[in-house]
A protein has these predicted regions:
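Glycine- and small/polar-enriched repetitive beta-structure motifs of secreted/surface proteins
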Residues: 4, 9-13, 17-24, 32-41, ...
Length: 493
């Protein structure tokens, strides 16, 4: 043999083994320094097989190296270190480098103050106190950090990257999953191509979501904390943002996006949950909260323009501080409210509540139910009010209350089933009551006031001329300034 190794019989293994030249057998007085390294020699029927030991050695500081080009520090700085593999290099005390071109370099302060590093795998690099790099082409730089997987990369202290091409670029980062990336301080990234911190591609940049094409300048300049992305291709950026679910995206400070997306690859995830406004919240499949303090909850819910609320399926709140709740409810006016199914609210400070209700006038109120294939509840005049099934208030300050009632002139008021007030400032009170003249008033079932400034009071009472008056059941005033008082009374002027 040579000056470094010798062959002895191992009673425990029941075979010949290669050990250090200074090793002793069981009966020796000195302790064996290195036991059973490299290989055993097995006896064969036709004779024995020879074994050629690779280059290697043990230093006076108990540092072990094995392999062509393997190196350790022979001084006290390299005590108890191990380098195994071609061109492997274990640079500091208690560091371990195993694999071709692997490098392990811990932190050495003094003979009694040091922390090793561990690098296992071809072309791995572990640099820093207590660092661990496992895989092929894995790189870990930063004290107490861990990188596991092919081409995993850790850049700063106290971080973890686990998975093929995973990245942990700042301190306190946890990235787990193939191509997962944590680019902000304290970021959490869990899932395939999940990204926390530094929006390096956005909606139209790097649509393939590949770490190899991430914008390095953006990563390095990102200085915000606490983003968390969990799920397939989830993205959280902006500082304290949270994205949970497939393709969920929280892209502003303190934004929250929870929900799934579609698509089989990174380029066709067009339907995804997104919270892009500061302190915005989007929850549900394809829900979107676009501006500051927006809240969107439900499948395809959409809130935009700031402080907007959209809750339900396919609901929209596109006006500032607007509220839309229900099913296919749409609110586009500022500070407006829409609650119910198939709601349309397009004016400022308007309110629409019910089924098939439209409030399109500023400050208008529509409450009730439309009919399938029939009329909707419509409050289209400014400050108009429509309450009841199929009611209509389409003029400024018009009021329609009661099923099928209509207030269709400025200041007109219709109260009662199928009542109509079509004259300016006219009033119709009662079922089927009608006031069609300007300033006309009809009170009673089927009462009718068609003359300007006319008044009809009583069931079927009728005042048909200007300033006429009919009071009583079926009373009729037909002439200008005429008066009919009493049941069945008539007056022609």
């Amino acid at each position: 043999m040579n000056k470094i190794f010798k062959v002895i019989w191992s009673k425990s293994k029941q075979c010949y083994v290669v050990v250090s030249e200074i090793a002793k057998n069981k009966t020796g007085k000195k302790k064996i320094v290195v036991a059973s390294i490299l290989a055993s020699l097995a006896m064969m029927n036709s004779g024995y097989t020879s074994f050629a030991a690779p280059p290697g050695g043990v230093t006076s500081q108990n540092a072990l190296w094995i392999g062509n080009g393997a190196t350790v520090d022979g001084s006290v700085k390299g005590q108890n270190s191990i380098a195994i593999g071609r061109n492997s290099n274990s640079k500091t005390a208690k560091s371990i480098a195993i694999g071709s071109d692997s490098v392990a370099e811990g932190v050495y302060m003094s003979p009694t103050n040091y922390t090793g590093a561990t690098a296992v795998g071809a072309h791995t690099n572990a640099s820093g106190a207590g660092t661990t790099a496992l895989g092929v082409s894995t790189s870990v730089n930063g004290d107490y950090s861990v990188g596991i997987g092919w081409n995993a990369n850790v850049s700063e202290a106290n971080s973890i990257a686990i998975g093929v091409q995973s990245r942990a670029a700042k301190s306190g980062v946890t990235a787990m999953g193939p191509s997962s990336r944590g680019y902000g301080e304290g970021a959490l990234s869990l899932g395939y191509q999940a990204l926390a911190g530094a929006d390096v591609y956005g909606s139209g940049i790097n649509v393939n979501n590949s770490p190899s094409s991430d914008n390095t300048n953006t990563i390095n300049s990102y200085a915000k904390w606490g983003d968390a992305a969990i799920g397939l291709r989830a993205v959280a950026t902006g500082g304290n943002a949270t994205a949970l679910g497939r393709s969920a995206r929280a892209a502003a400070s303190n934004a929250i996006a929870i929900g799934g997306g579609n698509g089989d690859n990174a380029t066709d995830n067009t339907e995804k949950t997104e919270a892009t406004g500061e302190k915005s919240t989007a929850i549900g499949y394809n829900a979107k909260a676009k501006n500051t303090n927006d809240i969107a909850i439900g499948m395809t819910a959409n809130a935009s323009d700031g402080n907007a609320i959209a809750i339900g399926r396919n609901v929209t709140s596109a006006g500032g501080a607007g509220t839309s709740i229900g099913y296919y409810s749409s609110v586009t006016g500022n500070q407006s409210i829409g609650i119910g199914s198939q709601i349309s609210n397009s004016a400022q400070k308007a309110t629409a509540i019910g089924y098939k209700v439209t409030a399109s006038g500023s400050g208008a109120i529509g409450i009730g139910s439309g009919t399938d294939g029939g009329s909707n509840v419509i409050a289209s005049g400014s400050d108009a009010i429509a309450l009841g099934t199929s009611t209509l208030a389409d003029s400024e300050k018009a009021i329609a209350i009661g099923a099928n009632s209509k207030g269709t002139a400025i200041g007109a008021t219709a109260l009662g089933r199928s009542s109509e007030a079509t004259g300016a400032s006219a009033t119709a009170l009662g079922s089927l009551a009608s006031a069609t003249g300007t300033l006309a008033t009809a009170v009673g079932m089927q009462a009718s006031a068609s003359g300007n400034e006319s008044l009809a009071i009583g069931t079927t009472a009728s005042a048909t001329s200007g300033r006429s008056l009919a009071v009583g059941t079926n009373a009729k005033a037909t002439g200008e300034n005429s008066v009919a008082v009493g049941s069945g009374a008539g007056g022609s002027g």
